[in-house]
């Protein structure tokens, strides 16, 4: 899977810098690319795209081909787990995911069908890995259990999370446990099919108080990581508890993650002083989309801060759909040559 060159996977495993700072971007495959828009122009259902092996393979490789990214991330969605659990997941253009809200853990299916249901995605992982140059890592992923739970209880993305935060605690805990169980199986399968690195996206982590963050983010993440490391002892796992603020420190120290991706609100000097594992991040995607000059300037500041550490350049969240491809190309060229 890996060659003698220093891959992202090796930087994380060895916990040491790998020479040049590597780069990949969250949501690097997607609507910002004209070739993506062309490939999906006849597809109306986003979930159908996610279960189409050949299309997922093509979409995953597009940004690697165009920009020579140092990693590919499998084209998929964190709500695949919700779909596997029997939730009715639909993506509405301009709105995002809409799900029939779950009222009780009894409504969720068990993990029995997970491999059958996700086989098209797993086969895409296998296919991408066979086509990807050896020096480039393939990243598999899943949503953090808290984030997936918040979507299936709220029924859509939320700014307040009022419904999930007022949900019966015992029911919420059981839903998170069920999601955790299925996520473990799914991620182990991704590794078996060829993923070199796993990233856990806990996009809604910032909604929680410190005690709830420990219960709903740290504990399930720890359980997932222990299960993976039980099978694959030094496997590189990146955690992304977005908007966790000072709780990033607890997350790094208590979950067992191999590396952490930081959002663009995290002060880089604070991260360098407090987070003692390989770091990934954290350019503001708004800068990349709307102010190329400022984005390049900020990218240099980030690299200057982290270049003596095991560090992977990324954004602090996903690429925005209207980001000009020339801005992405300029960023990649800067990071690779700086």
Swiss-Prot record:
Catalysed reaction, written as an equation: uroporphyrinogen III + 4 H(+) = coproporphyrinogen III + 4 CO2
Top EC class for this record: lyase
Keyword terms: Cytoplasm, Decarboxylase, Lyase, Porphyrin biosynthesis
Main localization, broad class: cytoplasm
Keyword Cytoplasm: yes
GO biological process: one example: protoporphyrinogen IX biosynthetic process
Residue numbers marked as site, Transition state stabilizer: 77
Pathway: Porphyrin-containing compound metabolism; protoporphyrin-IX biosynthesis; coproporphyrinogen-III from 5-aminolevulinate: step 4/4
Quaternary structure note: Homodimer.
Name of the protein in its database record: Uroporphyrinogen decarboxylase
